[in-house]
């Protein structure tokens, strides 16, 4: 089984990684690719012109650092929770439009399953449950698992 996990390092993403470990159980031979995405920050029309290009470069570098930490955390969770299974694990930080890159990477990786959290943090928080997960579910070349936490929705 080939599984693509998209993470931003949020608690919701960690839950998705843990759910992936539950699905894998003691299965060996799985191929897992963890991706975290950086969308290039763009100036807003109402920002002062005094904001320099260096500001955006620094912001992009910070986003890359956060993305690297997110994939490292996900790798650690998988290694810890799969009991040393024989599985292939790779990770990558990618640039581009979040929803498009997830779908494109799933096709390139020939994923059997995409795993994402139901929400994210920061930029992802505004997008993940709505447009990103909706786009991925409707355009992915494989099945998609959107993992909710117990704080999502009603607990009734």
Predicted regions and their residues:
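General small-molecule cofactor/ligand-binding pocket signal
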Residues: 33-35, 90-94, 145
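Glycine-rich, Arg-bearing micro-motifs that act as flexible, cationic patches
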Residues: 113-135, 153-156
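Small/aliphatic-rich secondary-structure junction motif
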Residues: 2-54
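Acidic, proline/glycine-rich short linear motifs
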Residues: 37-69, 152-156
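Structural beta-alpha unit
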Residues: 76-114, 151-156
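Short, well-ordered secondary-structure micro-motifs
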Residues: 16, 44-47, 103-104, 127-128, ...
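Short, flexible loop segments at boundaries between secondary-structure elements
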Residues: 142-154
